[in-house]
């Protein structure tokens, strides 16, 4: 599942809360055998836009660390909406490796049929 235009900066706090709640009810739900973070990492992706993070690069990088995954975010532009970010689509301060994951690797892994059309 891909969540578009939902933002992603709320995710670390939400996952922390889910994990805490899950630990408290594990005895009552033995069929839920994986932690919420694992379930989200294997099944859900989020679009980059809108970036609702503070403009400081350190804060954004810390958010990615708290999510414990660089595979959750997919490139998006929010075009053609009026609040489209234009040339400032990518937040400042992301490492080249993370930019490649967001713009190429994560979309190719999420939309596996894309890789077939690229090869053709």
Q: What positions do the PLM features span?
A:
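Aromatic-lined glycan-binding groove of carbohydrate-active enzymes
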Residues: 1-43
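Mid-to-C-terminal alpha-helical segments outside catalytic/metal-binding sites
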Residues: 10, 27-35, 45, 49-50, ...
